[in-house]
Amino acid sequence: MLLASAVVVWEWLNEHGRWRPYSPAVSHHIEAVVRAGPRAGGSVVLGQVDSRLAPYIIDLQSMNQFRQDTGTLRPVRRNYYDPSSAPGKGVVWEWENDNGSWTPYDMEVGITIQHAYEKQHPWIDLTSIGFSYVIDFNTMGQINRQTQRQRRVRRRLDLIYPMVTGTLPKAQSWPVSPGPATSPPMSPCSCPQCVLVMSVKAAVVNGSTGPLQLPVTRKNMPPPGVVKLPPLPGSGAKPLDSTGTIRGPLKTAPSQVIRRQASSMPTGTTMGSPASPPGPNSKTGRVALATLNRTNLQRLAIAQSRVLIASGVPTVPVKNLNGSSPVNPALAGITGILMSAAGLPVCLTRPPKLVLHPPPVSKSEIKSIPGVSNTSRKTTKKQAKKGKTPEEVLKKYLQKVRHPPDEDCTICMERLTAPSGYKGPQPTVKPDLVGKLSRCGHVYHIYCLVAMYNNGNKDGSLQCPTCKTIYGVKTGTQPPGKMEYHLIPHSLPGHPDCKTIRIIYSIPPGIQGPEHPNPGKSFSARGFPRHCYLPDSEKGRKVLKLLLVAWDRRLIFAIGTSSTTGESDTVIWNEVHHKTEFGSNLTGHGYPDANYLDNVLAELAAQGISEDSTAQEKD
């Protein structure tokens, strides 16, 4: 065992034998489930934190990621890195792919690039870690040494990965990416994890058909191109170590990875566009199912049955000796295969009824809600705030710091005792001024805070990038629409003693404004009007009043890419969950749900909306 502090990065093994990191948000979610222990069920539903990963479940006992619609299994691991490395600072390095979107580098590649960047080297050669690329920090470009093709790279900030302190386990059984040539070979293990990992690596080495044909060293790096660029910088320097060749006046330090292998029994990203785990074409899943024992298969089957109902499709109960669990009919066969492999008898029964809407209600039965004025609200286009510069806005929330602490500004990653490293359009403040946010006490270059404010919604509010404390009144970019609300004389499941509050949202399609992702481009509005339901209880009315505040602040909806259909430039929910299923809970968006009201209050509070905050605003 090793006593140390480290950041935890959860990673999955792709079909080319490379470990790909989950985003910081996903890693935090997995760690939370691990800390919850047996009461969490031993499985992690990734779609709960990232809707793009809705098909995936992680089984913490077998350390496998399970794709519900195909049955594909991928090994996962819990890896530790130095807190001073990129994941410990929330730094993400990404390259621009052919579609114009950004793909994060493998974690150890990103750490190597960040280390060179912090040492102020002009460029770094990645050849010695298996990639024929040069990263030029002056142009923020990646150059293919063979074809001279250049792509843009970027460095951005995200959440810091979860931190652990104390006793960390030593390297465990299963193999990972090969280390230096001098490292002695590890003896193979016969556990399911090792068998699965070795089958993936063997397929890569043997050049199997399908996606496994791609070379290991080219995965997660841009494909070669044909663009001819000027000659590379001088290459007289010799490689310094196996973690990356850095061309520049300073020597590189060893890799900042604490350990390259993870425990099979854990003890403790968005990145913007995270590379999603591979889809149905992989052969790994077929190999992996044969490696799991009855207990693991049974646990995966139960976890899948519990989660698939959130897909929104009418369900088919799959019965076994212990009862029944509903699953998506298109996926019931997958569950049946898993349960049969676990030795459980399987049969299909008639699906329960999906009840999306209440019984018909006449106009005379619709009543206003006691204590809530009116029965509808409208929002129009955003009104620009006039007369206040970013510097004037920030002045309300900041205290100047005459003697800055000797630590990094987490926006530009330069020392607070040095000028800001921000290189964009020049704010009017001096780059060496430092300020402390009044409530949370976090310290930044004022220059960096002004730049961050200018890149945001410019609504007079500020959110601390470290702890997410909101200063001022946060507003969103919700397009114009209407919100109606009233009482109907029916009860929700789980709330038999009260009527129901029905909310109807109506947003028409239109043209995106300057605050939206693609100004001047049209946006769609699918599924409107949207009907949502709350119990007419004291807490239900409290939620409604706060939802009205969120609506007025344009925080209920946004314009983006639908996680359900993949359509871009469309109206989507904005992190405040609503119940759209009236009389059942087959989709996961209905009742009964004992925790829903508390959960939505927490989501609203994260947007700066609570009874206390609204009372302070009125004062």
UniProtKB/Swiss-Prot annotation:
UniProt EC number: 2.3.2.27
Residues covered by region (Disordered): 238-281, 358-389
Highest taxon listed in the record's lineage: Eukaryota
Comp. bias intervals (Polar residues): 261-273
Database matches in Gene3D superfamilies: 3.30.390.130, 3.30.720.50, Zinc/RING finger domain, C3HC4 (zinc finger)
Keyword Iron on entry: no
One Pfam family recorded for the sequence: zf-C3HC4
Zinc finger (RING-type) stretch: 409-468
Domain WWE: 1-78, 79-155
SUPFAM superfamilies: RING/U-box (SSF57850), WWE domain (SSF117839)
Compartment list: Cytoplasm
InterPro entries per the UniProt record, alphabetical: Deltex_C, Deltex_C_sf, Deltex_fam, WWE-dom_subgr, WWE_dom, WWE_dom_sf, Znf_C3HC4_RING-type, Znf_RING
GO cellular component: centrosome; cytoplasm; cytosol; nucleoplasm
Keywords, comma-separated and alphabetical: Cytoplasm, Metal-binding, Notch signaling pathway, Repeat, Transferase, Ubl conjugation pathway, Zinc, Zinc-finger
Bias (Basic residues): 378-387
Catalytic activity reported: S-ubiquitinyl-[E2 ubiquitin-conjugating enzyme]-L-cysteine + [acceptor protein]-L-lysine = [E2 ubiquitin-conjugating enzyme]-L-cysteine + N(6)-ubiquitinyl-[acceptor protein]-L-lysine
Gene Ontology annotations of biological process type: negative regulation of innate immune response; Notch signaling pathway; proteasomal protein catabolic process; proteasome-mediated ubiquitin-dependent protein catabolic process; protein K48-linked ubiquitination; protein ubiquitination; regulation of type I interferon production
Molecular functions per Gene Ontology: ubiquitin protein ligase activity; ubiquitin-protein transferase activity; zinc ion binding
Involved pathway(s): Protein modification; protein ubiquitination
Enzyme class: transferase
Quaternary context: Interacts with NLRP4.
Domain comment quoted from the record: The WWE domains are thought to mediate some protein-protein interaction, and are frequently found in ubiquitin ligases.
Family: Belongs to the Deltex family.
Role description: Regulator of Notch signaling, a signaling pathway involved in cell-cell communications that regulates a broad spectrum of cell-fate determinations. Functions as a ubiquitin ligase protein in vivo, mediating 'Lys48'-linked polyubiquitination and promoting degradation of TBK1, targeting to TBK1 requires interaction with NLRP4.
Full protein name: E3 ubiquitin-protein ligase DTX4
